[in-house]
């Protein structure tokens, strides 16, 4: 089997292998609302040159919860906004309730059961929520999900089955419908955590 690889300067190279592993990950996906491009993603949050005085994080999954804890731990005024009633939707309800309670106890401001209507940029970012609340912060981070990074791979063209969310469909052995091609991590519909792909 051959793979055609292009480097940053568009130089092409063919690589041959018996089996091919796809582990290209995913990228942040933001909801569509006015000012959504004012948000930074988790990668950009790690590249900040200095800590903001305040941040709003939009989302309730493990990335949002992790970054809320990190920023709060560094003394940043942290606001966590999400649609569900508690953080970590899909996890055990007792864990979700206790974790949300502990986040509040540590000083994280929680705004459950709301969505962002718009983000305006002035001296600070002004985030308007669906319940008419306005939150003023130095940064706004989106952590509402990730989409597989497959658009440049050409996997559809060779017949690899793709799911509704744009993910590569794999079996319990991470094998695609093409027996010599495997996929792991955010590019699949399985558990999407960095350590799975490593």
Where are these regions (language model features)?
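Conserved beta-strand-loop-beta-strand element in the redox core of flavoprotein oxidoreductases
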Residues: 1-14, 120-134, 140
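Glycine/serine-rich phosphate-binding loop and adjoining beta1-alpha1 elements at the start
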Residues: 1-38
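Short hydrophobic core segments
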Residues: 14-25, 57-58, 78, 135-145, ...
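Short loop/edge segments at beta-strand edges and connector loops
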Residues: 24, 41-43, 112-114, 120, ...
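Short glycine-rich, flexible loops that bind phosphorylated cofactors or substrates
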Residues: 29-30, 64, 148-150
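FAD-site-proximal beta/loop scaffold in flavoenzymes
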Residues: 37-52, 135-198
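Rossmann-like dinucleotide-binding cores of NAD(P)H-dependent redox enzymes
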Residues: 46-47, 52-56, 62-126, 131, ...
């Amino acid at each position: 089997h051959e793979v055609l690889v292009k480097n940053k300067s568009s130089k092409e190279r063919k690589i041959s292998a018996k089996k091919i592993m796809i582990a290209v990950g995913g990228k942040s996906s933001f909801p569509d609302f006015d000012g959504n491009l004012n948000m930074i993603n988790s990668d950009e949050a790690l590249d900040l040159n200095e800590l903001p005085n305040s941040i709003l994080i939009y989302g309730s999954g493990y990335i949002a919860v992790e970054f809320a804890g990190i920023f709060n731990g560094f003394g940043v005024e942290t606001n966590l906004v999400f649609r569900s009633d508690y953080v970590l939707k899909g996890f055990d309800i007792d864990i979700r309730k206790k974790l949300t309670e502990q986040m509040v106890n540590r000083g994280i401001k929680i705004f459950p059961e709301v969505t962002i209507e718009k983000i305006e940029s002035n001296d600070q970012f002004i985030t308007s929520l669906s319940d008419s609340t306005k939150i003023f912060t130095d940064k706004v981070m989106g952590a509402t999900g990730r989409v597989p990074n497959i658009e440049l791979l050409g996997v559809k063209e060779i017949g690899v089955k793709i799911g509704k969310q744009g993910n590569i469909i794999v079996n319990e052995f991470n094998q695609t419908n093409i027996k010599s091609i495997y996929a792991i991590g955010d590019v699949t519909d399985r558990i999407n955590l960095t350590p799975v792909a490593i």
